[in-house]
Amino acid sequence: MKQQQKIVWSGADERKRQSKPFDGEKVYDACIIGGGVIGCAIARELSRWQLSLGLLEMRSDVSEGTSKANSAIIHAGYDAKPGSEKARTNVAGNQLFEPLCRELHVPFRRNTSLVVAFSSDGLAGLRELKSRGEINGVDGLSILSQAELRRREPAIGPSAAGALLAETGGICSPYELTIALAAHAVLNGLDLQLNCKVGQIRHDGRWFHLQTSRGPVRCQVLINAAGVYADTIHNQLSRQPIEITPRRGEYWLLDKSVSDAFSATIFQLPTAMGKGILVSPTVDGTMLLGPTAEDIDDKDDVRTTAQRLDEILRVAAKTWPDLPRGQFITSFAGLRAHARQNDFILGEVADCPGLINAAGIESPGLTAAPAIGIELARLAARRLNAPRRSQWQPAWQPPQPFRLMETEQRARAVRDNPAWGRIICRCEQVTEAEIRAAINRPVGAATVDGIKRRTRAGMGRCQASFCTPRVLAILSEELGVSRLELTKFGNGSRILTGRIGETVRSHEPPAADAAAGGLEVSHD
């Protein structure tokens, strides 16, 4: 195996730190609210300057909001309105994406995208998108005839009349990218604070004073990357309010057995509510259908609904008539932060110097993240008059996944560490060694979902029904806590309620030790 960087993170120590109140007030030059891909991209770029930097995330891990539940598409940039922040940062971000993923060791594939017209009337819409894309500076756009489209994608529906090909379209793993951005920032001095929900904020003209669930925070520059909660942050400090509406999108995910159905990401012509229902491969070999678009009031409502999931199947059938309904392995939903002006809200707030917004970040926010990160980090550094750091640590490289190793690599890995030979997740071929490394790494996992997003354990066809008890046992051992205390995604989402044969009140703290057996699964 290739020699890996020395692990510099103790999962057990970090879990204890992230669950305790602060020892006094935290003071930073700059502080970011929000640990999604935007907040972490800003943090990574801002760690290039000599300043004290904090990031506050209310959940138990980074990438727990919009950044974990989206289409994972790197958009070319033809859809955004020319002259908008979306158009500008989309095209710039697309150009930055491939080298960024290479540097951070994150999977990325430029698989191209196709916008399909399903009638001759729709061909005019394709020409309009192509013209818009060219105004935005997008390269590699062309119109395909029906015959050319079928040669590229034989499974496309019979009513497809033509398509817009975008050669710069791509796919990535958004949660792996977010975790890697955060880890790189931490290696370069970021003070990441999880389980840290921001409440009241005031500005005294020089300092921002934040009350959080773990204690007080003070900073000179405050960067608002709070996703669907960005209006809650902004409106405490500015007399010019903004409004963010949660727009829920639901998805279906299909098994790897149908991964070769389409090579490109297939869009239908977009509407005012978004880019419509897509059919897309993922970098992990599964197939994704969705999303829907439903404006809601609840900023935490990520339920799936039978009505919307049926809508996906009905609309996607036009793209994929032979859609194999027996190959679905899960469904999920995510929220997009939709601003009233239908554009990103970026930059320093006019009536609150030092407050920098990254608000209203919906599609193409993932694509735009590298460009937004650079732009807003430079803005913050200029306001603080901070000098550039002379040294910057390279990104941490995780071990190569066992499933991607050649036979000789696997044999060598097992000889060096027998834990490489113990398969924990059969569907995704994830080993014990990978799970332990995912806990004891920069920005390591402390939950079952944290393990899932760092290793793919639990993401396969059985959806964690086999590996969950084994993952819990390893987490318990590495973190030094009872399995009864472990959660799926933090915030009280405990998986186990007690030992079989015992009565455990749901609100009492667990008293079992980490090695206790005979545990009962929660079905709440």
Residue ranges and their predicted role:
Residues P82, K86-V91, V116-G125, L164-A183, ...:
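Short beta-strand to alpha-helix junction loop
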Residues A41, I201-R206, L210-G290, E294-T305, ...:
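Flavin-dependent oxidoreductases
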Residues S47-A69:
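Glycine-rich FAD pyrophosphate-binding loop
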Residues M1-A30, R48:
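Extreme N-terminal leader/targeting segments of oxidoreductases
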Residues A72-R152, G276-I277:
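Dinucleotide-binding Rossmann-like beta1-alpha1 core, especially the glycine-rich loop
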Residues A180, P270, G274, V283-D284, ...:
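C-terminal catalytic lobe of FAD-dependent flavoproteins
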Residues Y28-L55:
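N-terminal Rossmann-like FAD-binding beta1-loop-alpha1 element of flavoenzymes
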Residues L164-V221:
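Helical element adjacent to the flavin cofactor pocket in flavoenzyme catalytic cores
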